[in-house]
Amino acid sequence: MKLALIIGAGASIPFVPSLTSSFLTKELRRWDNWTGIISRVPSAINVSKRDIRRIVRGILSQTRKETNFEHIIEIIDKVCGYYTNNKKSLFNKEVNIIRRSNKDKGGSRNCYAIIPFLAREIIADAISSSLKNGLDSELLTKQGEFIKFLVSKSNNVSIISFNYDYVLDRTQNAINSKDYPSPSFCNGFTKEASDGYELDLEKLTKASNSIVFPHGSILFNHKYNGRRLIYNSSYDEAEADRWRSLKESYPPKQTSVGQHGVNTIDFNTFIVSGQTKETTMKNAPFNRLYQKAVDDIYKSDAIVIIGYSFHDEHINSVLSYYTETRKGHKVIVVDKQEINDAVDG
């Protein structure tokens, strides 16, 4: 029997209560975070920090207060892609934002090229700071015990995480230790490199017990013009490596490695965010990670879903197809229930 465990943001919140969408939105809107991250832009790449600040302030000023961080990143990607991609046509929404933000009066292509990277670094820093405040070891143990329980029921378990954090990574380390004699999980990053572990898609595809991060991770880093995806063992190493890559090669390849679309560049970064995830899924290696996730979901005899918000259409369509075509197979959804929530019966 094959099992699939799908983990969304709600699965991390018990470990780190602050890791909510509203928290990440506040951090992305916080101007101090932007001034801090912009100040880190290396002078060697010769872009105007003043122009970057002006562009970002203009974009943020035109987004509604209720807009969450993924929508903000979507707008950032499209506006910056518009200018990085020689001003190809856009939908009216983005054109209006550009006009109202007065973007046509300045800012080089290089300025626009770096902003999507900076936005994701703010998100990554916010997540890392929350995690550094301490992960509950008891909860990590419980998550490990739950995964161990699934493995006891099946020798073919696929874990699909849509989270950017490294909560599951720490659990995986425990699962693969001597304390857990169950079969080890493979996340595909098995090729040792001087700067971390490189993705081996063949091993990931063949792994019976696997962990897949189709939306990326704050531990990821693109190297060598985006041709290699590296997994670092710590956030500090991953972050330092990303900034080194930025200094060595500009415009930043890890934000412009995606192909030119009809309206914009697909910003294929270390984390896949925004409301344009489906577009990024066309690009390697995220397309292969997504294919692995889809394949494992469809081949599963049962699916357990924890903390997933059902906001990603590229995943919802797969689950919908599964329930319609795999009659009699179970889909178990685990969610938080407040004490005063109404319960039938």
Regions found by a protein language model. Give the residues of each.
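Gly/serine-rich nucleotide phosphate-binding loop at the start of the catalytic core
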Residues: M1-R170, A174-S184
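SIR2/sirtuin-family catalytic core signature
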Residues: M1-V16, S21-I59, T67, L201, ...
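Acidic, metal/cofactor-coordinating or nucleic-acid-engaging core segments within structured domains
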Residues: N46-R53, N232, D236-D295
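Short linear interaction motifs
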Residues: E138-I147, E192-Y197, F286
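Conserved beta-strand scaffold positions in the cores of enzyme catalytic domains, especially
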Residues: I159, I211-F213, V331
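A short secondary-structure junction signal
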Residues: D169-N173, H222-N232, I315-V318
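Short mixed-charge
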Residues: S177-K203
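A recognition module on extended beta-rich or small alphabeta surfaces enriched in W/G with H and D/E
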Residues: D195-S234
